[in-house]
Curated annotation (Swiss-Prot):
<keyword id="KW-0812">Transmembrane</keyword>
<feature type="signal peptide">
    <location>
        <begin position="1"/>
        <end position="15"/>
    </location>
</feature>
<keyword id="KW-1015">Disulfide bond</keyword>
<feature type="topological domain" description="Lumenal">
    <location>
        <begin position="16"/>
        <end position="184"/>
    </location>
</feature>
<keyword id="KW-0333">Golgi apparatus</keyword>
<feature type="domain" description="MRH">
    <location>
        <begin position="16"/>
        <end position="167"/>
    </location>
</feature>
<keyword id="KW-0732">Signal</keyword>
<comment type="similarity">
    <text>Belongs to the ATG27 family.</text>
</comment>
<dbReference type="InterPro" id="IPR018939">
    <property type="entry name" value="Autophagy-rel_prot_27"/>
</dbReference>
<keyword id="KW-0968">Cytoplasmic vesicle</keyword>
<feature type="disulfide bond">
    <location>
        <begin position="68"/>
        <end position="75"/>
    </location>
</feature>
<dbReference type="InterPro" id="IPR044865">
    <property type="entry name" value="MRH_dom"/>
</dbReference>
<feature type="topological domain" description="Cytoplasmic">
    <location>
        <begin position="206"/>
        <end position="259"/>
    </location>
</feature>
<comment type="function">
    <text>Effector of VPS34 phosphatidylinositol 3-phosphate kinase signaling. Regulates the cytoplasm to vacuole transport (Cvt) vesicle formation. Plays a role in ATG protein retrieval from the pre-autophagosomal structure (PAS) and is especially required for autophagy-dependent cycling of ATG9.</text>
</comment>
<feature type="transmembrane region" description="Helical">
    <location>
        <begin position="185"/>
        <end position="205"/>
    </location>
</feature>
<keyword id="KW-0653">Protein transport</keyword>
<keyword id="KW-1133">Transmembrane helix</keyword>
Length: 259
């Protein structure tokens, strides 16, 4: 039970982190969210549409990209339309827990940073990706995402944005809280999980104790007895709580009258 929970925590904790030390000189919070690049090609007798999604500061949103797997930084979806409807024929995902390599881009014409992904599982193949984030001082909110090439092995993409320019800490925009895609667990869910675990341990442990003491013919009878006692306890809770409230309120009224 705990292994899936730990796996989920690891997968969600290592998405493209805008507060990573390697990105400290940039302002990637300006790009936070899911961005899409779409291309349509006429492939008679069909039409092929390819959409690449990029999740910045958070994984790709399942609401904006329902065909993509969960917890991916980059996702490519290929759809083919023969008559009226598009059919998904190919999905490529670069999982958020892949190790990322950050390489500064410094040349006479361009500055920024390159983020590399290596060894993403795609069927029986391993695929790689390199995304170049290039500084564009003149772009204020009008960022450009471009897919340079994809050959079923290597993805090259480029993002021109003000976010890729070296920025002082005072000028940085703080990352907003990631969009809840229904993939995150709130405090209520954790309380529910621990309650279920506690009740399971209480019921099974109590039945085992009764059985070992010899108070029950078999384990099933012991389990039934513990369940009946638990149901009686739950039924008696409202009366118990009401009695406590009446005593407390009655005590307060008595003190007030004495004064």
């Amino acid at each position: 039970m705990w292994f899936p929970i730990l796996t989920w925590l690891v997968a969600t904790a290592v998405a493209l982190d805008c507060s990573a030390k390697d990105l400290d000189s940039y302002n990637f919070a300006l790009l936070q969210g899911t961005h899409a690049v779409e291309s349509v090609k006429d492939t008679p007798p069909s039409t092929t549409k390819t959409t690449w999604y990029f999740g910045i500061c958070e994984s790709v949103s399942s609401k904006k990209a329902p065909a993509c797997p969960k917890n991916v930084d980059i996702c490519g979806v290929t759809e083919v339309k023969v008559d009226k409807d598009y059919i998904v024929t190919q999905v490529v995902g670069f999982n958020s827990n892949l190790e990322k390599k950050y390489t500064p881009v410094e040349s006479k014409n361009e500055n920024g940073i390159k983020i590399s992904y290596k060894g993403a599982n795609w069927g029986s193949s391993l695929v790689n990706a390199e995304v170049y984030y290039i500084c564009a001082e003149d772009k204020d909110g009008d960022d450009t995402f471009t897919v340079e090439s994809w050959d079923d092995e290597m993805l090259f993409a480029q993002v021109k944005s003000k976010a890729a320019c070296v920025t002082s800490k005072d000028d940085k925009k703080k990352p907003k809280k990631p969009e809840d895609n229904g993939e995150s667990w709130g405090w209520f869910t954790w309380i529910f999980i621990f309650m279920v675990l506690f009740l399971s341990i209480y019921i099974i442990g109590g039945a085992w104790f009764q059985y070992n003491k010899g108070n029950a013919i078999d384990f099933q009878s012991a389990l039934r007895e513990v369940l009946e006692n638990f149901v009686d306890l739950v039924r008696g809770l409202p009366s118990f709580i009401r009695e406590i409230i009446e005593k407390v309120t009655g005590s307060n009224r008595g003190e007030y009258s004495a004064v």
